[in-house]
């Protein structure tokens, strides 16, 4: 039987130009050889067209299987003279039973019962042991090194992917922290709503992934508490009182109905950390922000604002999440094709963040 060795988690990444078609529907046949994984693959096509935007197709599923195959359960590593057990599991999906013989191939470098002739055994010899006492007096302070989780072993397709996050620059980030727990763009400036919510979102995501907790949960939740108490208005939207140094860092929400876009950004961050910070005012704040966006949604005019508001409402489980986004889609029936230009950096193009938020809101 052929040996299966190719087990990628993703593999089909191709870029091609669709031919023109009078009917408006183009076809591009391709022939590929699927990997050795016995699983179900999902294919999604993303297309771009000048002057129109982004189109995402519905997922197409392809099931790969073999009627009969052998699965060897091998250890992840073996050292010299170690005794290991190799188990062979046979899978038969045929309509009839099969009588087979599983034989381990003989190798000179391996000591196995499959070796022809009398089996050998390992001899023992006496070992002289000498002990020394050593006093260690380490200099300096204790140093800690964080090692991210590494659980790649036994990962196969159709298994929920592990999320691996490397958190760097935590101490440098603390230099932008004010005495009240907020974050500012430079010393002397008041806390920034956008920057504090962004830091809260990143740290909330990193908190659950750290093997050794270096992030204080109380300080993390204090950020959310400050945003809610100090920067949220009665109608649910969030205010920005800190100066904006680089508008390009803010995903392009400057000039895109800022009250809506900023509220959506903060709502996304609060949703990321709601499982960690369970204070009562957090869920009440999320409800007020969701209500504000739902009231504003029918009147939104800019592409970025409707994209990020739709994604924020989708995270908040709002039934109105895609009500306005559909009106920005192309009437050609494409999955998601934004047809309203968004001015960004002086060019009449749709910003990449707007495309990403649009795709996330319908995924």
Curated annotation (Swiss-Prot):
GO terms for molecular function: endopeptidase inhibitor activity. One of its GO terms (cellular component) is extracellular space. Pfam families: A2M (PF00207), TED_complement (PF07678). It comes from the Eukaryota. InterPro entries: A2M/Complement_sys (IPR050473), Alpha-macroglobulin_TED (IPR011626), Ig-like_fold (IPR013783), Macroglobln_a2 (IPR001599), Terpenoid_cyclase/PrenylTrfase (IPR008930). Coiled coil: none annotated. SMART domains: A2M. This is Putative protein C3P1. It comes from Homo sapiens (Human). The gene is C3P1.
């Amino acid at each position: 039987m052929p040996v299966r060795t190719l087990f990628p988690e993703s593999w089909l990444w191709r870029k091609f130009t669709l031919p023109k078609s009078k009917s408006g529907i183009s076809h591009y046949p391709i022939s590929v050889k699927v990997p050795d994984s016995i699983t179900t693959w999902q294919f999604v096509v993303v297309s771009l067209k000048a002057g129109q935007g982004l189109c995402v197709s519905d997922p197409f599923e392809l099931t790969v299987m073999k009627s009969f195959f052998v699965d060897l359960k091998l250890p992840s590593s073996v050292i010299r003279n170690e005794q290991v057990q190799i188990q062979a599991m046979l899978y038969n999906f045929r309509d009839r039973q099969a009588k087979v013989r599983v034989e381990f191939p003989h190798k000179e470098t391996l000591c196995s019962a499959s070796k022809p002739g009398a089996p050998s055994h390992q001899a023992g010899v006496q070992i002289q042991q000498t002990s020394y006492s050593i006093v260690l007096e380490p200099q300096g302070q204790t140093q800690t090194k964080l090692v991210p989780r590494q659980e790649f072993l036994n990962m196969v397709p159709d298994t929920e992917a592990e999320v691996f996050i490397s958190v760097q620059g935590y101490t440098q980030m603390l230099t932008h922290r004010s005495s009240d727990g907020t974050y500012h763009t430079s010393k002397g400036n008041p806390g920034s709503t956008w920057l504090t919510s962004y830091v809260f979102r990143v740290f909330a995501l990193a908190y659950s992934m750290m093997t050794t907790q270096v992030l204080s949960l109380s300080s993390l939740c204090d950020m959310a508490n400050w945003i809610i108490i100090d920067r949220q208005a009665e109608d649910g939207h969030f205010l920005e009182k800190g100066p904006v140094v680089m508008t390009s860092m803010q995903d392009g929400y400057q000039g895109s109905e800022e009250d809506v876009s900023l509220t959506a950004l903060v709502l996304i961050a609060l949703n990321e950390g709601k499982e960690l910070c369970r204070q009562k005012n957090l869920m009440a704040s999320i409800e007020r922000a969701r209500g504000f966006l739902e009231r504003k949604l029918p009147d939104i005019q800019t592409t970025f604002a409707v994209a990020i508001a739709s994604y924020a409402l989708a995270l908040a489980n709002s039934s109105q999440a895609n009500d306005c986004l559909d009106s920005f889609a192309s009437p050609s029936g494409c999955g998601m094709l934004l047809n309203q230009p968004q001015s960004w950096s002086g060019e009449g193009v749709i910003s990449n963040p707007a495309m990403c938020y649009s795709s996330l809101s319908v995924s």
